[in-house]
Design a protein with these regions (language model features):
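C-terminal and inter-domain tail/linker signature
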Residues: 1-148
Length: 148
């Protein structure tokens, strides 16, 4: 099911709440709802993900690849937003990812264990209200510890 109608990507990011809504739509509708069309719609062609694996292309294609790799490793992955904050063109999102580790993640083959992975994401948006940059700080050490 596509949720492109959830927000109008042609509307300029005129207020902090507009871009916060885009980040909320990414996590709740695109990521949790497995909607690659929405990821494509909210991602600018010049999008750069500072946490992507080497060789990941920029733009919507790369953004979708990163998400699909995560879904392959944790097929039931679900992200719960704890806090959203924005200033001008930037949104910070703090939350926790939950799911079952079934495929390779951070170099570790699937364990079948439930995971809880705390994360902080930064998104920057262009004047068209599309994401142009992503960076993240994740508790990878805590996650790796849970794999033991």
């Amino acid at each position: 099911m596509t949720t492109r109608g959830a927000w109008d990507p042609s509307r300029a990011a005129g207020s902090d709440s507009d871009i916060e809504g885009r980040v909320r739509a990414f996590w709740e509708q695109a990521f949790n709802g497995r909607d690659l069309d929405l990821i494509d719609a909210i991602t600018a062609p010049e999008f750069v993900n500072h946490n992507a694996l080497p060789g990941t292309p920029p733009g919507p294609e790369g953004h979708c690849q990163v998400v699909q790799r995560l879904w392959a490793a944790v097929p039931d992955a679900h992200f719960e937003i704890k806090h959203l904050a924005s200033d001008r063109d930037t949104v910070i999102c703090i939350g926790t990812m939950f799911g079952t580790h079934e495929g390779t993640l951070l170099g570790v083959p699937g364990t079948g264990r439930r995971v809880e992975w705390r994360q902080c994401h930064m998104y920057r948006f262009n004047q068209d209200g599309r994401a142009v940059e992503h960076d993240a700080i994740r508790d990878d050490a805590g996650l790796l510890h849970r794999f033991r």
